[in-house]
Amino acid sequence: MPPANGKKGKKGGAAKAVRRIQYRPKSFKHSRFVKHAHFWSAAPEEDFDAILAEMQLADAKTAAKEATKKDAKGGKGKANGSAAATAAPEEAKQAWQAEIAAMKPIDEQFPDGKFPHGIDESPYYLKGKDGRVATDRESNEEKKALDISYEEVWQDYRRSAEAHRQVRKYVKSWIKPGMTMIEICERLETTSRRLIKEQGLEAGLAFPTGCSLNHCAAHYTPNAGDTTVLQYGDVCKIDYGIHVRGRLIDSAFTVHFDPKFDPLVEAVREATNAGIKESGIDVRLCDVGEIVEEVMTSHEVELDGKSYVVKPIRNLNGHSIAQYRIHAGKTVPIVKGGEQTKMEENEIYAIETFGSTGKGYVHDDMETSHYMKNFELADEKIPLRLQKSKGLLNLIDKNFATLAFCRRWIDRLGETKYLMALKDLCDKGIVDPYPPLCDVKGCYTAQWEHTILMRPTVKEVVSRGDDY
């Protein structure tokens, strides 16, 4: 899951990454805010938009009920096309729900609590370009003891990672053109909840399933009523997270069906692997970005008779990870000229790269679905006048805390008519919206991502699997 944009320095030097927590887009649908001295006040037209959205949702539900009634009145022996069309997807849903219910949770698969390791990439970890990385970490007794003291932490990450691997293997077995994006997300998330044995904030989903299509690079997941269908010619980025005690795995892959996109997808995968190879304790973040750009731009893709150099999306980055915090402050650029800040021992990173046939720069677009509580204000008591806002905030605190969430998940908890309350929380800065991030229309984007543990003795690519 990518962080917010980075900005160039005044002299065009090192790019300074901006934390996602500071990212505040332009409208509520694109999340606009009007700031006053001591509070956030909503623009009147945005109130109207939220009310209109509530009305449209209510109208859609009413229409669905009316259609159901008409189907019921079709009479005996009369085939009703609408009823038959509704029954088929429902039967299919019941079938995959039963299939998932039969799956064995990860902790039951490994009852001794020792979960599979990721891939230890020691040779790359121990060989810094200028000798800055110590060469005795694997054999140093002090480092071994320190590593062992963190074993419970590493096991939480490994349990999350094993769930991620099994979920994505299952997803790849059935995802295909013709499926709605809502069906894809619901089936993936149901599987994740089952395998990680969801239990409040103790274990569960770390952030909404991203399934961004084509020119949209990140932060798209369908809201209720979204009828978007996956097509043969789509390039879909599947980005989802799973956590145990807030120790989360952030890993992503790209799905496509038309082989003409193979060069684009492979270019980005190679760039991600190059970034992982370069990463390590005492490695500068800018060095990772430089190697990622070098590898990615060495690839070209031909689409419909036109050649494109694969461009890294310069205002998307990898990032550090902390407990219950998807973006912990450090950003890992995917272009050269980034920060001189170094990676440190015991840090966790999501190394992710995005490639594009467009401009290589994303902007806010489409309807917002992703939200996350402002981590900096998580413990502050900001006065709320609307009772609905207070109730929604309590629901967020109880179910998501500082983890990202989406509107579908609020719907799933039985909350209704909450858009005005959600907007109120956004206006006051308590919750931050994260709209879809898109390059120019008509272009295509791809993404690959892994989570790595900077253990004292070794660099462990904990989310690595046989697939990627």
Curated annotation (Swiss-Prot):
UniProt KW Protease keyword: yes
Means of activity regulation: Inhibited by the fumagillin analog, TNP-470.
Region (Disordered): 63-87
GO BP: germ cell proliferation; proteolysis
Comp. bias (Basic and acidic residues): 63-74
Name of the protein described by the UniProt record: Methionine aminopeptidase 2
The keyword Cytoplasm is assigned to this record: yes
Protein family according to the UniProt entry: Belongs to the peptidase M24A family. Methionine aminopeptidase eukaryotic type 2 subfamily.
The record's free-text note on cofactor binding: Binds 2 divalent metal cations per subunit. Has a high-affinity and a low affinity metal-binding site. The true nature of the physiological cofactor is under debate. The enzyme is active with cobalt, zinc, manganese or divalent iron ions. Most likely, methionine aminopeptidases function as mononuclear Fe(2+)-metalloproteases under physiological conditions, and the catalytically relevant metal-binding site has been assigned to the histidine-containing high-affinity site.
Subcellular localization, as worded in the UniProt entry: Cytoplasm
Gene encoding the protein: map-2
Keyword list, A-Z: Aminopeptidase, Cytoplasm, Hydrolase, Metal-binding, Protease
Binding site for substrate: H219, H327
CDD domains: MetAP2
Effect of a null allele: RNAi-mediated knockdown causes sterility due to a defect in germ cell proliferation and/or differentiation.
Signal peptide start and end residues: none
Residues annotated as transmembrane: none
Cofactor: Co(2+); Zn(2+); Mn(2+); Fe(2+)
Coiled-coil residue windows: none
Species for this entry: Caenorhabditis elegans
Binding site for a divalent metal cation 1: D239, D250, E449
Record-listed E.C. numbers: 3.4.11.18
Binding-site residues for a divalent metal cation 2, renumbered to this chain: D250, H319, E352, E449
